[in-house]
Amino acid sequence: MPDSFPTTDMALTHILVVSDVPESNRWYQDVLGAEQYREYETSAVLSFNGVWLLLVGGGDPTPDKPEVLFLPPDARKVSHSFTVRVENCQASYETLKGRGAEFLTPPYDWGGEIRCFFADPDGHLWEISQLTA
């Protein structure tokens, strides 16, 4: 039997638990330029450069995840982040800052990479990174 995972017709979806779905939905569209695919009462589906983002308002355990709670993150503790590779970190920084992104610092040159970080309204961490070496 041929291997059935992964296949070429698969798509990766990131589930982001947020405290306010409409606010986060607006932020992802206005700041990151994501496109809304669908919106529901307690969630929204966005497309961002070929990746699906599912914004959900939290949730209790369900039969298929019996001991798992979906909770918004603690912005001071990060166990996951997104990195977007860009050609020009400074230009991307200026664009995103102009759209309302709040950066932790301006771009920093590590010698081989220039990067900086910002967070969405709930503290999900995003990085823009330019490889220079």
Which residues are covered by each model-predicted region?
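Vicinal oxygen chelate
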Residues: 1-13, 35-84, 93-119, 130-133
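Conserved beta-strand-loop-alpha-helix junction that forms the acyl-donor binding cleft
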Residues: 15-21
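Acidic di-acidic motifs
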Residues: 20, 88, 120
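Short, conserved charged micro-motifs
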Residues: 23-24, 89-93
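Conserved active-site tyrosine of GNAT-family acetyltransferases
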Residues: 24-29, 96, 123
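Major-groove DNA-recognition helix of helix-turn-helix-type DNA-binding domains
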Residues: 32
